[in-house]
Amino acid sequence: MVKIRLKRLGSKFNACYKIVVADARAPRDGRFIEAIGEYNPHSKALRINEEAAIQWIKNGAQLTQTVYNLFKTQKLNEKINSVLKSEKVAAKQASK
């Protein structure tokens, strides 16, 4: 299973994170498929490549709870839900 999750960077007590797409079996700071964003909890800075995130979710990637909460602060989960709903409607119309 492919997950969108956080990869920890930085030194002790000064963590920052990359938002990455990785295999669920890979270690937290191990190999990843693609980096799609960055998050700094100290300055609350969050950068996300929205197109890449939406594309990975369309392809079946699952969000971890922390990444889902970060997406929710950016209102990105609403965009994702609308894209997924429109695809379901299009698939139903195509099957008719």
Swiss-Prot record:
One GO-annotated biological process of the protein: translation
Protein's UniProt keywords contain Disulfide bond: no
Keyword Coiled coil: no
UniProt entry keywords in alphabetical sequence: Ribonucleoprotein, Ribosomal protein
Domain of life of the source: Bacteria
InterPro entries in the cross-refs: Ribosomal_bS16, Ribosomal_bS16_dom_sf
Pfam family, one: Ribosomal_S16
Gene3D superfamilies: 3.30.1320.10
One of the record's GO molecular function terms: structural constituent of ribosome
Protein name in the entry: Small ribosomal subunit protein bS16
Species whose genome carries this gene: Mycoplasmopsis agalactiae (strain NCTC 10123 / CIP 59.7 / PG2) (Mycoplasma agalactiae)
Upper taxonomic lineage: Bacteria, Bacillati, Mycoplasmatota, Mycoplasmoidales, Metamycoplasmataceae
